[in-house]
């Protein structure tokens, strides 16, 4: 107590800060849905620390400065941390780092520099792994630092976490603490696949790691690309601590625990500053997000002497990078059309500098995200930029929302080609149905149209497609069949022979099959198997183009979403015009024959290995034409597995399931039947 009466205004501000910080902790740690940048959170926390330092009589046991994090969720079994999982204090500039070094040396009464260990500050989820006699017996999240959540079953699915420690030089009991991360590449792939499925995407790798680790179903966690890195020992029984922290990390490596490679032992604070500058320059080359560096006293004996304050160790500090999140205002929300027809809302922003880059546009990912985040025109929002990732809007600051903030609706027409835009129920992504006609989708449409399973135009690769579009030789998909030799030979590295070969391949592609043509159209959800199913059902293109959604849904393996996609595609006037033009230019196929009764009809086949007389595509096509079904994986529903040369794992699985195995000769006899 300092004997000074606390002004009412100050008391009110302290209470308000505690409320805000506790709320943000809940959103960050429990919901994995932060609504403010880390830099803003740090400012609030430091303001509260300063006020409590000035007025110590205001400090209460429940103040955020006296504890870590938030309450654990009730759905997981609680785990008590025998040694609290404390977070680190932060500094944001060289002055703060030098002050940290000075405090340590004064406390130890040392004038000369001593060793620190510098590590990247990983931007993931803290995790405690408990091993008994080398076996993983428990994994727990940090929670509030004292009580976490038991996530053992989920953690067992992370490939980088050993279920049994390597060697035999491990202690009777050891608690290994570290960080669970989702690498940038895995995060980008996960979000791409989630968007394709119409599922929820994550705003950043940290949220993805947290959400994945805290799934109630371990099977979901198992599908997420998570990694774990160890950085500290908590409990230890049956073995003495080594001399230094870097020796602990060597133990981890020996036991099979991953340790981040960019760790350096330095002599004194100058070495720490050099390490920081190095990581500022190289951070984007790292496979995962980092938001600063961690500096620890290397000597474990010195760590013990320095001890802890209530919230953090005295022997370590986090030196954070400049904020990669800033606040700005949404001036407008516009729509971009991607290569596959995905219509993405994009925020046009008041320009703001984030990590040294001026940001004036930011993605909102999809309409589910737009509405979940509730971003409106006129909102003050948080913008994040991490590495090469496109800047994104994290969320609005609701307290700053103007009364006239405008809610955006999904556009009914494509902003590029004015075709219908549809968003199937249950999917996150709205899509343009312009298909063949939409200029935004032109490149991908042509590449797909010419691909091996479609019209199979040999020599018309990605680079040549790009060149034809760039030179305006192809303006829509029918332009492939209107290319002239003189125009092709005028292009770089395209001689007469190359032009002749390409034109020959284009001419050859005109003779195709109805399933290949349907697949080539690039209708969303219509793969080559579905294309064969449609061709076998309707026999004629005209009948398919006139089919209702109800008729389409009656077909085996075609659900409501794919039925709607097919119907919408063929009912776009421009798509129908381009299909007719392709036929007028000579694209044709033999009449699909009705399936006659055969031994193949109604049976499911899987191919493994190479056939001598047929390609895989030809074999699958013949199966479908005969009324059978060709699939890519073996299951209890498979009737026959066709075994070619050098069969793969499907052969072994079929044997284990007792499924009929036939060779190429037997398959050809079935076809003749």
From Swiss-Prot:
GO terms for MF: DNA binding; DNA ligase (NAD+) activity; metal ion binding
Domain BRCT: start-end pairs: 595-673
GO annotations of cellular component type: cytosol
Keywords assigned by UniProt, alphabetized: DNA damage, DNA repair, DNA replication, Ligase, Magnesium, Manganese, Metal-binding, NAD, Zinc
Catalytic activity: NAD(+) + (deoxyribonucleotide)n-3'-hydroxyl + 5'-phospho-(deoxyribonucleotide)m = (deoxyribonucleotide)n+m + AMP + beta-nicotinamide D-nucleotide
Gene Ontology BP terms: DNA repair; DNA replication
Cofactor: Mg(2+); Mn(2+)
Residues annotated to bind NAD(+): 38-42, 87-88, 119, 142, 179, 296, 320
Domain of life: Bacteria
Enzyme's top EC category: ligase
Enzyme Commission numbers on file: 6.5.1.2
UniProt-listed InterPro entries: BRCT_dom, BRCT_dom_sf, DisA/LigA_HHH, DNA_ligase, DNA_ligase_AS, DNA_ligase_CS, DNAligase_adenylation, DNAligase_N
Active site: 121 (n6-amp-lysine intermediate)
Annotated residues for binding of Zn(2+): 414, 417, 432, 438
Membership in a protein family: Belongs to the NAD-dependent DNA ligase family. LigA subfamily.
HAMAP family cross-referenced by the UniProt entry: DNA_ligase_A
Known function: DNA ligase that catalyzes the formation of phosphodiester linkages between 5'-phosphoryl and 3'-hydroxyl groups in double-stranded DNA using NAD as a coenzyme and as the energy source for the reaction. It is essential for DNA replication and repair of damaged DNA.
UniProt cross-references to PANTHER family, sorted A to Z: CHROMOSOME TRANSMISSION FIDELITY FACTOR 18, DNA LIGASE
Name of protein: DNA ligase
Gene from which the chain derives: ligA
């Amino acid at each position: 107590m300092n004997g000074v009466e606390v002004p009412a205004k100050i008391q009110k501000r302290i209470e308000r800060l505690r409320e805000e910080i506790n709320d943000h902790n809940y959103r960050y740690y429990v919901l994995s849905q932060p609504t403010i940048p880390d830099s803003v959170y740090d400012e609030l926390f430091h303001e509260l620390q300063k006020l409590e330092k000035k007025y110590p009589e205001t400090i209460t046991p429940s103040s955020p400065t006296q504890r870590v994090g938030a309450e654990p969720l009730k759905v997981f079994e609680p785990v008590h941390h025998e040694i609290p999982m404390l977070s680190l204090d932060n500094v944001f500039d060289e002055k703060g780092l030098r002050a940290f070094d000075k405090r340590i040396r004064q406390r130890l009464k040392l004038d000369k520099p001593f060793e620190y260990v510098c590590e990247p500050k990983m931007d993931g989820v803290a995790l405690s792994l408990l091993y008994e006699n080398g076996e993983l017996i428990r994994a727990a999240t940090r929670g509030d630092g004292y009580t976490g959540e038991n996530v053992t079953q989920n953690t067992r699915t992370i490939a980088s976490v050993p279920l049994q420690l390597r060697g035999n030089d491990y202690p009777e009991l050891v608690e290994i603490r570290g960080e669970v991360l989702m690498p940038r590449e895995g995060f980008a792939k996960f979000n791409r696949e989630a968007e394709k499925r119409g599922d929820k995407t994550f705003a950043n790798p940290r949220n993805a790691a947290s959400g994945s680790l805290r799934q109630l179903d371990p099977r979901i966690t198992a599908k997420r690309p998570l990694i774990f890195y160890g950085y500290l020992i908590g409990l230890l029984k049956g073995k003495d601590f080594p001399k230094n922290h870097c020796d602990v990390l060597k133990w981890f490596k020996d036991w099979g625990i991953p340790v981040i490679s960019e760790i350096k032992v330095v002599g004194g604070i100058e070495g720490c500053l050099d390490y920081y500058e190095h990581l500022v320059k190289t951070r984007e080359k790292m496979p995962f997000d980092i938001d600063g560096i961690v500096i620890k006293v290397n000597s474990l004996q010195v760590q013990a002497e320095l001890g802890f304050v209530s919230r953090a160790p005295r022997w370590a500090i986090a030196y954070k990078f400049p904020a990669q999140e800033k606040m700005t205002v949404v001036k407008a929300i516009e729509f971009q059309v991607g290569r596959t027809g995905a219509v993405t809302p994009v925020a046009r922003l008041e320009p703001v500098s984030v990590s040294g880059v001026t940001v004036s546009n930011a993605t909102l990912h999809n309409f589910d995200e737009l509405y979940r985040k509730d971003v409106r025109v006129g909102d003050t929002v948080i913008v994040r930029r991490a590495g090469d990732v496109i800047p994104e809007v994290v969320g609005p600051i609701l307290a700053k929302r103007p009364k006239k903030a405008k809610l955006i609706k999904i556009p009914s027409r494509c902003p590029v080609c004015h075709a219908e835009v549809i968003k199937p129920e249950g999917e996150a992504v709205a899509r343009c149905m312009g298909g063949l006609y939409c200029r935004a989708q032109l490149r991908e449409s042509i590449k797909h149209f010419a691909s091996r399973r479609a019209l199979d135009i040999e020599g018309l690769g990605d680079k040549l497609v790009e060149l034809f579009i760039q030179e305006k030789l192809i303006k829509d998909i029918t332009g492939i069949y209107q290319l002239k030799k003189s125009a092709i030979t005028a292009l770089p590295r395209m001689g007469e022979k190359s032009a002749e070969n390409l034109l020959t391949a284009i001419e050859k592609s005109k003779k195709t099959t109805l399933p290949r043509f349907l697949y080539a159209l690039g209708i969303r959800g219509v793969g080559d198997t579905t294309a064969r199913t449609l061709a076998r059902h309707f026999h004629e293109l005209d009948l398919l183009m006139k089919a209702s959604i109800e008729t389409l849904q009656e077909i085996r393996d075609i659900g409501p979403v794919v039925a709607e996609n097919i119907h919408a595609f063929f009912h776009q006037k421009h798509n129908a015009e381009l299909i007719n033009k392709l036929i007028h230019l000579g694209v044709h196929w033999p009449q699909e024959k009705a399936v006659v009764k055969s031994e193949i009809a109604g049976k499911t086949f899987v191919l493994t290995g190479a056939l001598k007389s047929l390609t895989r595509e030809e074999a699958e096509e013949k199966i479908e034409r005969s009324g059978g079904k060709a699939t890519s994986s073996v299951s209890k529903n498979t009737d026959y597995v066709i075994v070619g040369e050098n069969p793969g794992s499907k052969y072994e699985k079929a044997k284990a399931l007792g499924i009929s195995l036939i060779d190429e000769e037997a398959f050809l006899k079935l076809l003749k039947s």
